[in-house]
Amino acid sequence: MSKKNNCGNITRRKFIGNAAAGSAFIAAGPVTGFFSEGNQKNEAWPKDAVKYRFHMIGHGHIDPVWLWSWAEGVAIVHSTFRSALDRMNETPDFTFTTSSAQFFQWIAENDPAMLAEIRRRVEEGRWNLVGGWWVEPDMNIPSGEAMVRQGLYGQLTLEKLLGRRAVVATNPDSFGHANTLPQIIKLQGMENYIFMRPGPGEKTIPADLFWWEGPDGTKVLTYRIQLSYNNDGSVKSRIKNILDKATSQPMKSFMGYYGVGDHGGGATKVSIKSIEALKTEKGAPAVFFSTTDNYFREVRDDKKLILPVIKDDLQHHAVGCYTAEWEIKKNNRLSEAALVTAEKITSIGSKVWGANYPRKEFVSAWQRVLFLQFHDSLAGTSLFEHSQTAREGYGYALDIAGQATLLALQKLEWQVPAEDPSSQYLLVFNPHARDINSVIEYDLNQGKYLKSSRVEDEKGNPLLHQWVPGSTETGSRKKLVVSTAIPAFGYRQIRLFDGDPLISKETVKAEGNVMENKFLRVRFSGNGTIGIYDKEKGKEVFEGGATGCSAVIIDDPSDTWSHDIKSYSNEIGAFGNATIKVLENGPLRAKIRVRTEYGDSSLAIDWSLSSGSRNVEAKVTLDWHEHLKMLKFSFPVDVEAPVATYEIPYGHIVRVTNGDEDPGQRWIDLSGQKNGSRAGLTVINDAKYGYSVKGNDMRISVARSAVYAHHNPKVLDMNAEHLWMDQGIQTFRMLLVPHADTWKEINIPGIADEFTSPPLAIYQGIHGGSMPKSGSFLSVDAPNINVTAVKLSETGEDIIIRCVETSGSGVRATLDLRFAGSKWEGNFRPFEIKTLRLNFITKEIREVNLLEE
């Protein structure tokens, strides 16, 4: 929730007072004071007001968590719904609109009688179900698959509890909207969209009613709410304010939202009475109780109405939300990936090797994650106490996903023979639908293999490996680091035994401040910055040499949301005074630790380079103790005419390189020309969402130390105690991918998949078994088609397979479903999301929507 420019004519003090009073105050239906219509009858209407129509949308916006706990949010839902039902009993044509399947799930569990009452009003058409999602989430930070699940569990829950689904998607309070949403929304059974942010002062659009077109060509009819989704004051004044700018709009019909919100409440008695009075007022526009469904039906039926088409994303509002509260954001990324991986392995495992697919537990885990994606939670703009709630919720989801994955792989491992008692065995599993080559780490009892160890795959081919310090201080266990190929969505057994290790001509070494392999020379400066030299191309990756990953400090006095901020540019320092230490020196991997400091904070980055690799990996440990400052990592890529590409939910977007703060998913790429040839750098990470690019300087936002739930215009007393965000230790990983080909040609989305959902290794005991020592269950032949989800259907025992085109290029692809003895071949248009439903018994494969129908 952001209240900036959101309260119409009311003051912030009145808004906060209203939120604190809550819906119990609203239910009393005051008719004087703050909620009074005052002298509205004396306000003259514009001469042409009668030409316009106002669909009055009774609404009570509910933030289930924000300046209050989720427990209070549950109470707000109940009291707001009670108030709406009471108003319906009093006024026969009053209508009420609300979203969020989670709210109705709470009502179903705690007040079945109220749910039955709501269902009757839904059947009458007076209770308008909108949204179709589990909650109103952030619309930039969740992954594409999480947005799919918002609608899957939201729509199915609405239908189960209330007998119908939403046809209007709505996220009025979210802080920006990715341009891939139209396809997702439409494939969830909704044709229309409502938003409010960014407002007119943040993004200029040709009309508040328009066709929003996604990069795949899907369009949804979209409406931007004027002024606010809350109206606690004069209904007439609100309508007049909208009419003041109506001549610039192509339509004659508008939606007029009214009702107390944020802390719930809904329509008041006085606002309902004022609307009834306006129905007969001379010179007034047509004003009537209505629903969002009715509004969109009316404007769609107007065949003369010509509306603009917008193909952009809808940004920006409150850019600090991309970075605030690092732990919530990292746990969100980890939970999304863990649940997807668990579903993939257990769904196919249930059909092939008898693994358990814990359907109810997966649904529960997803619903917990989806709730925590509510915009004030995932954006980091809630009160401090919510951090613990979020930590527990993500832990719940990660535990369910982890246990399901472990037990399924154990079931597989027990059936793959590992019979030599003088050897140790690992089974490594690749959860992606393409072959990969990966470096695997696993702590083992090193024992007699300390001086003489050989590692082979299941065919007896030797594998390059090395030993590094393990995770214990007992001396008996070391970490085995081994490089191996793993088949597409499949597994391979590797064996460690006493013997001569593989001696490779292609090794890697580290000495002093330099590490080097066949392709790259990596060096570090006295300030801790990195230089990468491409030995094949004879080029430096960074402008000026060793200038990459400068840890830049920016003055950031903004509030939690960073209201009125477009970019973070006031640099006041940088981490420096580096100490450099070699940690590993081949033959498979070199690793150098670079420690720097700034103020009361310290930064340690373990940079690693593997034999034969063209990428540089970093494990970052930040101990942050700054206040009202921001940390960004700067990568000045040595290119001209730079083009910046950001991953967004189930897609990517090219944005201008003007330094503005932008949201992104796992990767950002900056490509251009250098001396007549192509060059570029992609940075992939497993935890961050805020980025900026100015010219050729690409930056990742690492930490913001604002105060929890601090909202302008409140001025902080710097002599008082405050709860500061992002303090202490945080860790995350990055992968730097320099390239001469385009990011599409080297398949950056696939590399990001492998980096953020790495292959899994499991220890094998000594036993027999009937399954082969390697196998592949599923693969796709087109590099720009990612298999993003494999799961059991929500109804029945079919297999759901979701694929996404990642490069923006149409392609014909073949899915080899070896686990089912079947294949599927079909065409993908650019950016298309395609969902297949496989009947494992009949082998029938059909294309379905995102609701699996």
What do the PLM-derived regions correspond to, one by one?
Residues 139-160, 226-246, 590:
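Alpha-helical scaffold elements lining the catalytic groove of polysaccharide deacetylases
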Residues 45-67, 185, 513-524:
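An acidic-aromatic substrate-binding cleft motif
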Residues 181-184, 206-209, 276, 281-286, ...:
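C-terminal (or distal) subdomains of carbohydrate-active enzymes
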Residues 8, 30-53:
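C-terminal segment of N-terminal export signals and the immediately downstream linker at the start
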Residues 65, 218-418, 431-433, 595, ...:
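Catalytic grooves of carbohydrate-active enzymes
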Residues 49-54, 79-91, 107-165, 176-187, ...:
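Catalytic alpha-helical scaffold of carbohydrate-active enzymes acting on polysaccharides/glycoconjugates
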